[in-house]
């Protein structure tokens, strides 16, 4: 029986300042570091042992993974970083203060941008200096693949090939896996794993630094789900 642990990165500096982050590479806040270390202790206390680890190419998720693995004495396990586990790209909203954006466009519109399954945010042009096209961590990607903005539907479509090619085969082989990623890439995975509807996924919250443990049978049917609370 394989186990999968999903953990959203600890609080980031832009979580703290209430800014849209997306693909911007923001570090953990002091609280975020504490959350990640505490999550590692929870993992250790629960006796969870992993065979493989996956994370995004963004610092806040990578550091969270490393803190969790270090605290649980598993820093040595194989680790893969991929852009496919990145946070949802928030387009032209990235860097904006959420409260100020709501005051400008209205609470309802911002809620739709943040939580709707299939509504895109205002897009960021590839010519913009903040475009990920200019970031060397994506240099090997076709520029046409690099997004200028995503909704949860597009995020799921981005995540799924990696799930099917890299993660699911390991779980089917009975291996235990940990994924440290982001609120929306993990919401996308949870939607698929739990078969959550397009409407209900809007209400799913992923708390920072909280490990979520799934137990699967040999066909990847979910047998149980548990949150290792703070």
From Swiss-Prot:
Enzyme class name: isomerase
Active-site residue list: 9 (tele-phosphohistidine intermediate), 87 (proton donor/acceptor)
Keywords of this entry: Gluconeogenesis, Glycolysis, Isomerase
Disulfide bonds, paired cysteine numbers: none
Pfam families recorded: His_Phos_1
Highest taxon, organism lineage: Bacteria
Pathway, per record: Carbohydrate degradation; glycolysis; pyruvate from D-glyceraldehyde 3-phosphate: step 3/5
Binding-site list for substrate: 8-15, 21-22, 60, 87-90, 98, 114-115, 183-184
Annotated family: Belongs to the phosphoglycerate mutase family. BPG-dependent PGAM subfamily.
Identification of the protein by name: 2,3-bisphosphoglycerate-dependent phosphoglycerate mutase 2
Gene that produces this protein: gpmA2
